[in-house]
């Protein structure tokens, strides 16, 4: 019997089917032999051999039928074997997939731990960077403070000989407390001139060249009471610094005398000569005078000039002038009959609160900032 019914690899599940195929192959001796010889071959090779038998005319029909049943049994056997192989392959793939899943599940905690460690490291680095930036800012602030202290120490270390002095009239010198305020006035004037030129490191040289021989101390003024106040301060050639709301035609074309006699805080009778200061040629910063211009005696055509913003810090300049007791607010200490009426124009008004003189075109007081409209309820 060529086909064993108990053989599970034959591909037949029922024994009757196996027995019937064996009977059909047994009708000719070549049938069982064809089945047993080709068990180890592939289906392509078996098909090629059966084709040769069919083409051979010497083979009888019974032999052909027996070989055909053997070929059928071999085909079923090959199909069953191929199915088993595919089933084993699928099972292997399933096992491999489950193995990969188990590996992924086992590696997931490790991956999470690594991600957490990386995030912690990034946060630590960011914190260190922030701390470094904070330390850098603190060091920069300390550096700036040290520079400021060094600059202040250098300014304090300058000798008194290079600090400028301002001469005032004997009548002002005789006022109470003027000698105690004179040292601060000299230092403020020197710092003002140094800041205006933009060269604070050259304050000593500028003070020597600008004020040597032209500005004297109050003691020298007292020793020579007959001397002129103009001669002590010298003559300054103005470089046509622009004045706020000043008429263009009223500006002198040549070097003029800059008068500060209206804003001097003089409680006693002073000379009618103007307050004149001589500055060096290097003193070229743009400064706008806060005092009104002196009108000339000749009638010139009036042309209004548009107001403009101060190009320099007027707050610091006025503060220095106030330290030197050169401020418009000091006019309130003078009697009305002793004010210089030559500096008033038709329409100028006095502030009812601070008594400062303002131009007719101003609506608010330049000194206290209150409006003229507050006078009328």
Curated annotation (Swiss-Prot):
Belongs to the TEX13 family. Interacts with CNOT1; the interaction may inhibit CNOT1 binding to mRNA and subsequently CNOT1-mediated mRNA degradation. LRR repeats lie at residues 142-165. The gene is Tex13a. The keyword 4Fe-4S does not apply. Residues 122-156 form a coiled coil. It comes from Mus musculus. Keywords: Coiled coil, Leucine-rich repeat, Metal-binding, RNA-binding, Transcription, Transcription regulation, Zinc, Zinc-finger. Residues 92-377 are annotated as: Required for repression of transcription. The keyword Transcription regulation applies. This is Testis-expressed protein 13A.
């Amino acid at each position: 019997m060529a086909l064993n019914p108990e053989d599970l690899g034959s591909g037949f599940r029922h024994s009757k089917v196996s027995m019937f195929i064996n009977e059909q192959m047994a009708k000719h001796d070549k049938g069982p032999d064809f089945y047993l010889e080709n068990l180890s071959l592939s289906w392509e090779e078996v098909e090629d051999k059966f084709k040769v038998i069919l083409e051979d005319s010497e083979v009888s029909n019974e032999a052909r039928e027996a070989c055909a049943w053997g070929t059928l049994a071999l085909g079923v056997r090959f199909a069953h074997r191929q199915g088993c192989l595919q089933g084993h392959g699928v099972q292997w793939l399933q096992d491999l997939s489950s193995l990969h899943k188990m590996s992924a599940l086992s590696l997931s905690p490790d991956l999470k731990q690594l991600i957490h460690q990386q995030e912690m490291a990034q946060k630590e680095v960011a914190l260190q960077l922030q701390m470094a930036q904070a330390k850098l800012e603190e060091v920069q602030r300390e550096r700036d403070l040290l520079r400021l202290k060094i600059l202040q120490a250098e300014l304090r270390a300058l000798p008194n000989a290079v600090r400028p002095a301002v001469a005032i009239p004997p009548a002002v010198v005789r006022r109470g407390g003027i000698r105690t305020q004179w040292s601060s006035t000299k230092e403020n004037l020197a710092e003002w001139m140094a800041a205006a030129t933009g060269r604070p490191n050259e304050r000593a040289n500028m003070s020597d060249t600008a004020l040597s021989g032209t500005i004297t101390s109050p003691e020298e003024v007292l020793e020579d009471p007959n001397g002129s106040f103009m001669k002590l301060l010298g003559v300054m050639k103005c470089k046509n610094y622009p004045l706020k709301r000043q008429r263009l035609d009223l500006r002198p074309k040549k070097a003029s005398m800059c008068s500060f006699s209206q804003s001097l805080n003089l409680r006693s009778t002073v000379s009618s000569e103007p307050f004149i200061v001589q500055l060096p040629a290097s003193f070229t910063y743009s400064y706008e005078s806060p005092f009104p211009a002196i009108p000339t005696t000749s009638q010139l055509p009036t042309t209004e000039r548009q107001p403009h913003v101060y190009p320099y810090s007027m707050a610091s300049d006025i503060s220095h002038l106030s330290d030197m007791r050169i401020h418009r607010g000091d006019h309130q200490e003078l009697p009305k009959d002793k004010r210089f009426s030559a500096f008033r124009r038709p329409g100028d008004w006095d502030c009812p609160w601070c008594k400062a003189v303002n131009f007719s075109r101003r609506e608010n007081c330049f000194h206290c900032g209150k409006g003229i409209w507050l006078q009328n309820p």
